[in-house]
Amino acid sequence: MAIRRILRIDDAEDRKILKMQCRPVKLPDRNLKQLVADMFETMRAAHGVGLAAPQIGIPIQLCIIEIPAEYEERADGSVVEVAPAEPYVLINPRIVKMSGEEVMRDEGCLSLPGWYGMVPRQTWVTVEFQDLNGKHHRLRRAGDLLGWAIQHEVDHLNGILFTERIRDLSTLRDITKERDAQPVDQAP
């Protein structure tokens, strides 16, 4: 496995690739499993939830998403996993149905690290895609991180950046500056 360079929205050459309409993946593809492994390693190293192939310079219809595991603290102070991480590989995904109703979400992107803005997303979507074995799937998600991540990653495959979805650019902000501006607790 290898960590790949993530292309940036604010780099002119990278942006050309990020704005491309991606070509479909022809399955089977014996190199795809290694690419997917590299994508997961890259996404995890960048602390992301999703990554599309064009974000690492490969303009094909492939994206990955991993919903983080959930944990609970027990009465004795120990922590236990209550929901495992959910990894998804979506090949040639297409959103085939959507709610028609939007919700505003605070959203960021690994191609513009540290920046977030309010993005309108459908309250539910149905997506059709293939897995690594070429099997076709249909998945509906409503009002959760996976549903919003699907919309974000499919946008990447269509050359649409999250910054283009923001209706009020005053909501676009650099959270690293916000984080750096917070006072440091100096208690002993």
UniProtKB/Swiss-Prot annotation:
Positions with a binding annotation for Fe cation: 109, 152, 156
Enzyme Commission (EC) number: 3.5.1.88
GO terms for biological process, alphabetical: co-translational protein modification; translation
Cofactor needs: Fe(2+)
Gene3D superfamilies (UniProt xref): Peptide deformylase
Cofactor note: Binds 1 Fe(2+) ion.
UniProt GO MF annotations: metal ion binding; peptide deformylase activity
Record key words, sorted: Hydrolase, Iron, Metal-binding, Protein biosynthesis
Record has Metal-binding as a keyword: yes
Domain of life from the UniProt record: Bacteria
Active site, renumbered: 153
Catalysis: reaction(s): N-terminal N-formyl-L-methionyl-[peptide] + H2O = N-terminal L-methionyl-[peptide] + formate
UniProt similarity note: Belongs to the polypeptide deformylase family.
Entry-linked NCBIfam families: pept_deformyl (TIGR00079), PRK00150.1-3 (NF001159)
Functional description taken from the UniProt entry: Removes the formyl group from the N-terminal Met of newly synthesized proteins. Requires at least a dipeptide for an efficient rate of reaction. N-terminal L-methionine is a prerequisite for activity but the enzyme has broad specificity at other positions.
Name listed for the protein in its UniProt record: Peptide deformylase
The species this protein was found in: Chloroflexus aurantiacus (strain ATCC 29366 / DSM 635 / J-10-fl)
Gene coding for it: def
